[in-house]
Amino acid sequence: MKKERLEQASAFGKDRVKKKKNTDTSSNLIPVPKGATKEKKRVGRGPGSKVGKTAGRGSKGQYARNTVRRGFEGGQMPIHRRLPKRGFTSKFHKEFYPVNLRDIEKSGLTGNIDAKIMVQSKILDKETTLFKILGTGEIKKAIHVIADGFSQSAKEKIEKAGGSIKLRAELKLATSETKK
């Protein structure tokens, strides 16, 4: 049977012979129960298909021609236009990535900790990411952290352990002033 198909393929060209579905993957080895998959309905392909001409949409009218757009309420003033505009997005708003003391303790960081070290220990993705140290967890060793922000509880816990904190913005200002 297979040889005959190959001979036919060489005689008529490979595009003339129907290809069998790939059945060598593990998911295809298990037979699919009858009725588990439903074939897509081909509509609008002539009267012999039983869903030709109007393609199951009834005859004429708004719904036969196209769909109604999202949020359309039949001509009534839609809710997104009935409700007033409110607020704005500040262009000065900064989004801080939260870093808990628990994360620093878990990664085993000690000594001076800044963005570069946090990227190396995979706490942060990039050095340029703004991050804030939060106080969830305990810190046992003295650490000296340079970050963009600190919560009150994080400040207390770091200083209690004998560490220190510095804001990255203050360091940038100090270095820019010394360059002048």
Curated annotation (Swiss-Prot):
Q: Where is this region: Disordered?
A: 1-62
Asked if the keyword Ribosomal protein belongs to this entry, the reply reads yes
GO biological process entries: translation
Q: Which UniProt keywords apply?
A: Ribonucleoprotein, Ribosomal protein, RNA-binding, rRNA-binding
Q: Which Pfam families match?
A: Ribosomal_L27A
One GO cellular-component annotation of the UniProt record comes to:
cytosolic large ribosomal subunit
Is RNA-binding set as a keyword in this record?
Answer: yes
Q: Which InterPro entries match?
A: Ribosomal_uL15, Ribosomal_uL15/eL18, Ribosomal_uL15/eL18_sf, Ribosomal_uL15_bac-type, Ribosomal_uL15_CS
* Molecular function per GO: rRNA binding; structural constituent of ribosome
Subunit: Part of the 50S ribosomal subunit.
What job does the chain carry out? Answer: Binds to the 23S rRNA.
The UniProt entry's sequence similarity note says: Belongs to the universal ribosomal protein uL15 family.
What protein name applies here? Large ribosomal subunit protein uL15
Origin species, per record, is: Leptospira interrogans serogroup Icterohaemorrhagiae serovar Lai (strain 56601)
Which lineage ranks, top first, belong to the organism behind this chain?
A: Bacteria, Pseudomonadati, Spirochaetota, Spirochaetia, Leptospirales
